[in-house]
């Protein structure tokens, strides 16, 4: 007999995301102690390397060294892209604190963070309470990061009004693939299908393959990665509010960022970001 079990509601999915985020934080504490050593090992490893919590999920080749010169017109010189109340790139909310999110599109912790806080961040933006600065980088060495960065670069340049939705959908897709451990789905076609679902036009989606093949936005990726390293950061996601690094353990609920913003006026505690003056 066919199952009539309904699909999980949005509330149920977000509750599951909260539970997963808690588990991931505990795992992250263990993994971050090994992170520096692991990344150094990858740099000196064989031409084809397997990394990730689920061995075999992602395979990348170090010989893919093509770097294109395209740079999104709305991106800042450091590679970041800001969003204000209109939810379009290159905008900001005057006088509002900046929420900086450093991430790698191949980071499942980043995907869990994004899934949990998507609606909250959208509300804070629309209410003019923050300016969001997305700060993509490539620290895990994965081809998937290049695929999404090139797709995102194209969307930012050609259909920017869909960029934030595309960003969130790309993370949602990665979470789904990561949880299924089906690395065969980490393809341009999967990303293209996701892009269409967020309203990206067919003509732009059709250009994904060539853009990825040419690594057209490779310079943008390298710039964001350089910014991450120059600031002395160690892992993703790294989240700053008004220049102060937030403890990920305090961000496990879907209202945690709002509470942090509320606390700014009262002198909320935090850690000054590495590389900043204070």
Where are the model-predicted features located?
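Processing junctions and N-termini across compartments
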Residues: 101-104, 233
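C-terminal region of N-terminal signal peptides and the immediate post-cleavage residues
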Residues: 54-75
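A short beta-strand-turn-helix
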Residues: 78-97
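Short strand->helix junction
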Residues: 106-108, 246-247
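C-terminal low-complexity, acidic/polar tails when present
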Residues: 70-79, 275-278
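N-terminal export signals
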Residues: 40-59
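C-terminal cap of thioredoxin/glutaredoxin-like
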Residues: 2-34, 38-40, 60, 64, ...
């Amino acid at each position: 007999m066919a199952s009539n079990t309904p699909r999980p509601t949005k509330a149920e999915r977000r509750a599951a995301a909260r539970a997963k985020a808690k588990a991931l934080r505990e795992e992250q504490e263990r993994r971050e102690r090994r992170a520096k050593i692991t990344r150094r090992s990858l740099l000196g490893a064989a031409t084809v390397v397997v990394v990730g919590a689920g061995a075999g999920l992602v395979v990348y080749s170090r010989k893919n060294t093509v770097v294109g010169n395209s740079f999104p017109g709305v991106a800042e010189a450091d590679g970041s892209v800001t969003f204000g109340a209109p939810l379009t790139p290159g905008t900001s909310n005057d006088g509002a604190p900046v929420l900086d999110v450093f991430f790698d599109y191949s980071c499942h912790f980043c995907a869990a963070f994004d899934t949990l806080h998507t609606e909250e961040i959208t509300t804070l933006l629309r209410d003019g309470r923050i300016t969001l600065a997305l700060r993509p980088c490539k620290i895990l060495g994965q081809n998937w990061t290049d695929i999404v960065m090139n797709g995102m670069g194209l969307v930012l340049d050609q259909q920017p009004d869909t960029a934030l939705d595309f960003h969130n959908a790309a993370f949602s897709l990665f979470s789904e693939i990561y949880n299924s451990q089906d690395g065969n789905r980490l393809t341009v076609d999967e990303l293209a299908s996701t892009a269409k679902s967020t309203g990206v036009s067919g003509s732009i989606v059709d250009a994904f393959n060539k853009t990825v093949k040419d690594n057209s936005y490779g310079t943008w990726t390298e710039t964001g990665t350089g910014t991450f390293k120059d600031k002395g950061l160690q892992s993703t996601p790294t989240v700053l509010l008004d220049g102060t690094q937030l403890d990920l353990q305090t961000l496990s609920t879907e209202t945690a960022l709002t509470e942090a913003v509320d606390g700014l006026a009262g002198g909320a505690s935090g850690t000054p970001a590495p590389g900043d003056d204070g």
